[in-house]
């Protein structure tokens, strides 16, 4: 599962758990982005902080691992590179790439997006009420074509109604984030002064 994880929240964890169950996955590898190319105009917390929050959040689930592959590579993070690196590390594994369906809507802007469906089966997780692309080979929508080709599955996850943006905004304004993120992440945010307004 790739993501900025700024911060990782319970929706990410529920999504990983649900997808692992639905697709009978042995493990879910959370991969925090190093430099998210699509967020250059936004303030993003340091990669090391996002990595450590992800480690804290996933530690209690034996099916969850965290990879530094994007952070250690340096430079902008592109999914095609992430998948190639994970494939090199696990050459015999059948890979599934879990991401938000909202991110998938912008997939045609991703570097080498046509190649990424050859590297992994994509699973787009959605928030309730989100319109899922239809299984339609004749459609001009690239996502509908991938669904029809069996290279993309879409799964609705009720807990995905939580967003990292909302968590950051709540923390910045001094509102509680308990039960939106794991307890260890709440403590990490407080200890390291994450998302404190500079005003």
Curated annotation (Swiss-Prot):
ATP-binding keyword on record: yes
Instruction: Specify whether Transferase is a keyword of the entry.
Output: yes
Task: List the InterPro entries hit by this protein, alphabetically.
Answer: Cyt_trans-like, NadD/NMNAT, Rossmann-like_a/b/a_fold
Please give the pathway this protein is involved in: Cofactor biosynthesis; NAD(+) biosynthesis; deamido-NAD(+) from nicotinate D-ribonucleotide: step 1/1
Q: Quote the catalytic activity from the record.
A: nicotinate beta-D-ribonucleotide + ATP + H(+) = deamido-NAD(+) + diphosphate
Q: Which family does the record assign?
A: Belongs to the NadD family.
Query: How is this protein named in the record?
Result: Probable nicotinate-nucleotide adenylyltransferase
Q: What is the lineage of its organism?
A: Bacteria, Bacillati, Actinomycetota, Actinomycetes, Mycobacteriales
| Gene symbol of the encoding locus | nadD
